[in-house]
């Protein structure tokens, strides 16, 4: 399939399926785009994590030129997954994974810059979330691709206008994604801050996760003090009701 200036190919080698990401013919010999493909490889090797698609190499492939070689993921995009029926607990489980992997990516000094459900996959076995596209990701150590980037509807206003690029741009995009996931009360309160003007957003993913946990604990404390918990035979009912983040 084609995606912008890239081509995605499913290939089989040594009895195993792989994902190849190559440059489209129109830009295949362009040094800038070749540099961007190399940059994506370097960044993905730098942020190795269970929540990031594994890249194993960058090599020449007949008919396609240089390709990123990535693990094949048996699953669907988060965009497709959200169109299916899933319980609130399942949606919270996926949202938790998104926050965890982004906290790691940001701790590695990388900003994704193009977070959206179609750039994430959920595996069929185990419902594991994986980020699959770092084509627009950036880090301070790189000089290429420092212009506005992102996808309408998910990109932050300041990033769209070419303003400062930092983790708060990704946090805005996370807020948009969480809003589409129809999560529990603590998440709904948390995502509102993601969508505020730049200086009013969470400064980083750690602060966001801690705030959502705090909102959840306060909600449980309120239910306990109000006697709601006493009306239940076990705390499991409450746990299932709010889905701890």
Locations of regions flagged by a protein language model:
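AlphaC helix of the protein kinase catalytic domain
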Residues: 77-87
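AlphaC helix of the eukaryotic protein kinase fold
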Residues: 27-46
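Short beta-strand micro-motifs within the conserved protein kinase catalytic domain, predominantly
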Residues: 54-66
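Conserved activation segment of eukaryotic-like protein kinases, specifically the C-terminal portion
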Residues: 145-158
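Conserved short submotifs of the Hanks-type protein kinase catalytic core
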Residues: 63-77
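Activation segment signature within eukaryotic-like protein kinase domains
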Residues: 94-95
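Catalytic-loop of the protein kinase fold
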Residues: 106-122
């Amino acid at each position: 399939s084609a995606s912008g200036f890239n081509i995605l190919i499913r290939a089989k080698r040594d009895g195993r399926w792989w994902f190849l990401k190559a440059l489209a013919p129109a830009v295949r010999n362009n040094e800038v785009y070749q540099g961007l493909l190399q940059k994506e490889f370097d960044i993905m090797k730098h942020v190795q994590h269970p929540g990031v698609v594994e890249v194993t190499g960058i090599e020449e492939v007949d008919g396609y030129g240089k390709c990123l070689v990535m693990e094949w993921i048996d699953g669907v995009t988060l965009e497709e997954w959200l169109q299916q029926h899933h319980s609130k607990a399942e949606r919270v489980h996926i949202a938790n994974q998104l926050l965890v992997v982004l906290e790691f990516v940001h701790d590695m000094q990388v900003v994704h810059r193009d977070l959206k459900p179609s750039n994430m996959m959920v595996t069929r076995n185990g419902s594991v979330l994986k980020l699959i596209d770092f084509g627009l990701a950036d880090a301070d150590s790189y000089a290429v691709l420092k212009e506005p980037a992102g996808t309408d509807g998910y990109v932050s206003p300041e990033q769209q206008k070419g303003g400062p690029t930092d983790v708060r741009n990704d946090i805005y995009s996370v807020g948009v994604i969480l809003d589409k996931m129809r999560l529990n009360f603590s998440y709904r309160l948390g995502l509102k801050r993601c969508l505020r003007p730049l200086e009013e957003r969470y400064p980083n993913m750690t602060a966001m996760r801690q705030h959502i946990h705090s909102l959840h604990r306060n909600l449980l404390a309120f239910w306990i003090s109000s006697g709601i918990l006493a009306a239940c035979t076990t705390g499991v009912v409450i746990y299932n009701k709010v889905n701890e983040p």
